[in-house]
Curated annotation (Swiss-Prot):
It comes from Escherichia coli O9:H4 (strain HS). Homodimer. Belongs to the class-II pyridoxal-phosphate-dependent aminotransferase family. Histidinol-phosphate aminotransferase subfamily. Its EC number is 2.6.1.9. The lineage of its organism: Bacteria, Pseudomonadati, Pseudomonadota, Gammaproteobacteria, Enterobacterales. This is Histidinol-phosphate aminotransferase. CDD domains: AAT_like. GO terms for biological process: L-histidine biosynthetic process.
Length: 356
């Protein structure tokens, strides 16, 4: 009788892997969900495609063309995928040899870069950001040997600030002919002037990640994009699954990216920015809040006295925030998604009542 278990049959790196702790996986029984940087209210769409007996297009033409027009790039510079998370993984699969190459990222930042690399068996290297959360370019330069993909989130999740554009240029020069630089622009709709999409002609090794999950209010759709030069896109097409977007997803995405859909998105962004400033101003006056950091996104990072107790107290009241204590340099920090005015008021009232 064999004593080998199913777990024994698994790859060693998978057995040792800690899965990404998404907001939904962490759970909670709240009624004020401010932990996943989602848009706070639902948007409505009507399905127009009824051909569910047929496989969808591999790269739906209407979605690609609409997004290219919106982003100011050519259709051949756009790849659509199951969320930006799939784009993160595709870039590693296309450019990194497991057991040989490495990726590099700069914590505190988004957690899926490391999870995607570790799943595939690719080494992760980290260069923590400077005290102002900008790139440590010297540190990156020192660790670039063997690195094939560098991930930089801007605006950065969870800190909320933009990376200095001159630092991006320096990084792109450092990596020219050596590695792909990936600018994760999941939150760029909240600061569109900072996008690097206009740099693609200048830097053939630049790739940009985008999503419909944030400003487009479609987190449940799972639709993201990679913007890059055609040579990069063609390589990604070799490793992507044949039908990444279902017909209903492609249908809704095309509607969201129509001229009317873009107008509606920009109205949502203006509303969220106004609410963000209201919440920042209120947080700065609350005694348990030590520091509120500037944000270019739909969330706010703040440092609290007794942050773990504050987090649990609000959790028990049904207000679910995102604890960032385990991230480098974020001791005492909680991240708060900007929600509705009613949700902001629930947070403000609960924090004012904290005795710490």
């Amino acid at each position: 009788m064999s004593t080998v278990t199913i777990t024994d049959l698994a790859r060693e790196n998978v057995r040792n892997l800690t899965p990404y702790q998404s907001a939904r996986r962490l759970g909670g029984n709240g009624d004020v969900w401010l932990n996943a940087n989602e848009y706070p209210t639902a948007v409505e769409f009507q399905l127009t495609q009824q051909t569910l007996n047929r496989y969808p297009e591999c790269q739906p033409k209407a979605v690609i063309e609409n997004y290219a027009q919106y982003a100011g790039v050519k259709p051949e510079q756009v790849l659509v995928s199951r969320g930006a998370d799939e784009g993160i993984e595709l870039l590693i699969r296309a450019f990194c040899e497991p057991g040989k190459d490495a990726i590099l990222y700069c914590p505190p930042t988004y957690g899926m870069y490391s999870v995607s690399a570790e799943t595939i068996g690719v080494e992760c290297r980290t260069v923590p950001t400077l005290d102002n959360w900008q790139l440590d370019l010297q540190g990156i330069s020192d660790k670039l040997d063997g690195v094939k993909v560098v991930y930089v989130c801007s605006p950065n999740n969870p800190t909320g600030q933009l990376i200095n554009p001159q630092d991006f240029r320096t990084l792109l020069e450092l990596t020219r002919g050596k590695a792909i630089v990936v600018a994760d622009e999941a939150y760029i709709e909240f600061c569109p002037q900072a996008s690097l999409a206009g740099w693609l002609a200048e830097y053939p090794h630049l790739a940009i990640l985008r999503t419909l999950s944030k400003a487009f209010a479609l987190a449940g759709l799972r639709c993201g994009f990679t913007l890059a030069n055609e040579e990069v896109i063609n390589l990604l097409m070799k490793v992507i699954a044949p039908y990444p977007l279902s017909t209903p997803v492609a249908d809704i995405a095309a509607q969201a990216l129509s001229p009317q859909g873009i107008v509606a998105m920009r109205e949502r962004v203006a509303q969220i920015i106004a609410e963000r400033e209201y919440l920042i101003a209120a947080l700065k006056k609350i005694s348990c809040v030590e520091q509120v950091f500037d944000s270019e996104t739909n969330y706010i990072l703040a440092r609290f006295k007794a942050s773990s107790a504050v987090f649990k107290s609000l959790w028990d009241q049904g207000i679910i925030l995102r604890d960032q204590n385990k991230q480098p340099s974020l001791s005492g920090c909680l991240r708060i998604t900007v929600g509705t005015r009613e949700e902001s008021q629930r947070v403000i009232d609960a924090l004012r009542a904290e005795q710490v």
